[in-house]
Amino acid sequence: LEEVGTKFNMPDYQRARELTKEVVEEVASRVEIGMTERDGDALINQTLEKYNYEKKWHPNKFRIGTNTLKSFKEKSDEGIFLKEEDIYFIDIGPTFNNHEGDFGRTFQQGHNQEHRNIIMACEKVFYETAKACREQGLTGVELYRFAEQEAEKNGYVLNLKMSGHRLGDFPHAVHFR
């Protein structure tokens, strides 16, 4: 932990993370072929309401197919519907008890092996990079360099338009921007 506020509470932070993961998994379990990104966003909002979130650190992101390659700031192409063999991601940033639970995950519809490989590589790169950060105390630049190399080892190119940020008590922007 570094540079958290005086109100930071580890159990509250961990609970926020777990609730956020639950929301993402519940939304994914209700995703259906034919949905649009707007439908996915509505489903996320309905699910967040059920979990009594406080506010959002960032807008929901529910991206499908080719739109998954866009940065968060880029506008999605219209007219994209989830197909039988498709890839999509969910990224949400709710706060619970003033602690951020930002979490995202990539999913697939169907059994497309290429999509499965992408998802597995994403998770492997994430966990290997997190491990290296913990064990080696990487700086931000070193962390992204390491992640780039891990992506390349897995046959992919890291999309540097999609940078992450620290998590903790809200707002973390004081430390991020």
Locations of regions flagged by a protein language model:
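Active-site neighborhoods and metal-handling regions in enzymes and metal-associated proteins
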Residues: 1-177
